[in-house]
Structure formats: C-alpha cells, structure tokens
UniProtKB/Swiss-Prot annotation:
Keywords: Menaquinone biosynthesis, Methyltransferase, S-adenosyl-L-methionine, Transferase, Ubiquinone biosynthesis. InterPro entries: SAM-dependent_MTases_sf (IPR029063), UbiE/COQ5_MeTrFase (IPR004033), UbiE/COQ5_MeTrFase_CS (IPR023576). One of its GO terms (biological process) is methylation. Disulfide bonds: none annotated. Pathway: Quinol/quinone metabolism; menaquinone biosynthesis; menaquinol from 1,4-dihydroxy-2-naphthoate: step 2/2; Cofactor biosynthesis; ubiquinone biosynthesis. This is Ubiquinone/menaquinone biosynthesis C-methyltransferase UbiE. Belongs to the class I-like SAM-binding methyltransferase superfamily. MenG/UbiE family. SUPFAM superfamilies: S-adenosyl-L-methionine-dependent methyltransferases. The gene is ubiE. S-adenosyl-L-methionine binds at residues 76, 97, 125-126, 142. Its EC number is 2.1.1.163, 2.1.1.201. GO terms for molecular function: 2-methoxy-6-polyprenyl-1,4-benzoquinol methyltransferase activity; demethylmenaquinone methyltransferase activity. Methyltransferase required for the conversion of demethylmenaquinol (DMKH2) to menaquinol (MKH2) and the conversion of 2-polyprenyl-6-methoxy-1,4-benzoquinol (DDMQH2) to 2-polyprenyl-3-methyl-6-methoxy-1,4-benzoquinol (DMQH2). The keyword S-adenosyl-L-methionine applies.
C-alpha cells in the first residue's frame, strides 16, 4: 500500500519536500494565482490538446441521462458542461473544488453562458467529501489528483460517495511512454512552459510547480494499484498522446 503523507509527515510540492500540513495551502496559492488564466494554463501545458482529451474523457464515461455526477477539482467548469450534456435535463452535475477562486470562475462562466439548471457548486476537499455514501452515479477528477496531498484518502472518498455499479474516472498528466519523446517533453515542461507562464500570465513559479507536479504524480500502473487498494474493481487505464495523459477507470461493485 502506498504510504500516506500524513504518516510520513512530509510530502512533495513539485520537487520540494514540504510538511504535509502545508501542501494544501501552497497548492491553493498556485491555483488562486492561475484561476483567471486556467484555460490558458492548460493550453500552454498541453499545446491545446487538453480540449480533445476532455471531450474523449467524458464521451467514454459510463453515464446516462438522469444520472447524478460529481466532478472534483472542477475548475472552470469545462468538464461539468460536457457531463451535463450527457446526463440531460433530468440529471445533475455537482462541481466540487477546494479552491474558492477556481469555483467562482467556474460558476461565473457557466452562469454567463446561461447554464444554471442542473448545476451545483460545492467548495470541498477531495480527501473528506461532504456527501453521504452512495450519492453519485459517476465521480470524475481531471488534472486535479496530482495536486491532492493524500491521494489514497481522495480515492477512498471517491469510492465511498459512488453508488454501487457506478464508475470513477481520473484524467491526469502521466508518464510518457516513448523514450524518444521524453527529452522533448522535458524541454517543453521545464524550459519553455515557465517562460510562457511568465510571458502570458506573469507567473513563472506557478507554471514551474505544475510541470514538477506532473513528474511527481504516480505513473500509470501505480495509480491503477492505488485505485484497487481504495476498493475499486475492474481498474484499468488508457494512455492518450503517448502517455502524456492517462484515463484511469474503476467501478464500485
């Protein structure tokens, strides 16, 4: 079983070792800083491909009209909008995020587009969700799990609030599978991305952290094992774009 950072007392914040109790605050500062430029951040990190990844992530999810869905680390609401299209007028999407700034941006964007009915917004910590057991037919988290301090706790909470028969899905930057591409990817991540962050968002440090956080995230097989330890069955993953990102899925049976 992977070690909880609360057991060891320290965890990583990018490539830095920090006290586990401090990581949530540090991550919060990063996302408060980038909230208004979050879509730009994803465009810079993925060269714009994140939009296709997200569409595929939702299109292949186990969800049907009338379902109730929780989207964690919901950010600016782009995944929530796609999920609402899947669940229809009879369904509901709860957009959860620990960061009030991100949640506010998401709420404002959806409201300005006239997307009000069927959406709820909850500021919540993925490690201790404020929902009863078996509340949702589908639980998703995209580009958020790597920023959680205690990932094992978050996966257990996703399992707890999922209904029997439901699916949990994780979309996250992962480990590149092609050896020839790794130097190119590293160069973009550590040399180009922070400079782009400084140029377009006046915030090189946050973009440096985000690049580092990807390298510290568990690789594909490790995360699959963590999902199994959290209780999920039929765990599997699919690499996209050569492993730059991966979609992990598990079921509550």
């Amino acid at each position: 079983m992977s070690e909880s950072p609360y057991t060891s007392g320290t965890t990583h914040f990018g490539f830095r070792d920090v006290a586990a109790k401090d990581k949530q605050k540090l991550v919060g500062e990063v996302f408060t800083s980038v909230a208004r430029n979050y879509d730009l951040m994803n465009d810079l990190m993925s060269l714009g491909i994140h939009r296709a990844w997200k569409r595929y992530f939702v299109a292949t999810a186990q969800v049907k009209p009338g379902d109730r869905v929780l989207d964690l680390a919901g950010g600016t609401g782009d995944i929530a909008v796609l999920l609402k299209e899947r669940v229809g007028n009879e369904g509901a999407v709860v957009l959860g995020d620990i960061n009030a700034g991100m949640l506010s941006v998401g709420r404002d964007r959806l409201t300005n587009r006239g997307l009000v009915a069927g959406f709820d917004y909850v500021q919540c910590n993925a490690e201790a969700l404020p929902f009863p057991d078996q509340s949702f037919d589908l639980v998703t988290i995209s580009f958020g799990l790597r920023n959680v301090t205690d990932k094992d706790a978050a996966l257990r909470e996703m399992y707890r609030v999922l209904k029997v028969g439901g699916q949990a899905r994780v979309l996250e930057f992962s480990e590149v599978t092609a050896d020839w591409f790794k130097p190119i990817y590293d160069f973009h991540s550590f040399k180009i991305l922070p400079k782009l962050g400084q140029l377009f968002a006046r915030d090189a440090d946050s973009y440096q952290y985000l690049a580092e956080s990807i390298r510290k995230h568990p690789p594909q097989d490790s995360l699959k094992g963590m999902m199994g330890e959290a209780g999920f069955a039929r765990c599997h993953y699919k690499n996209l774009t050569g492993g730059i990102v991966a979609i992990h899925s598990g079921y509550k049976i």
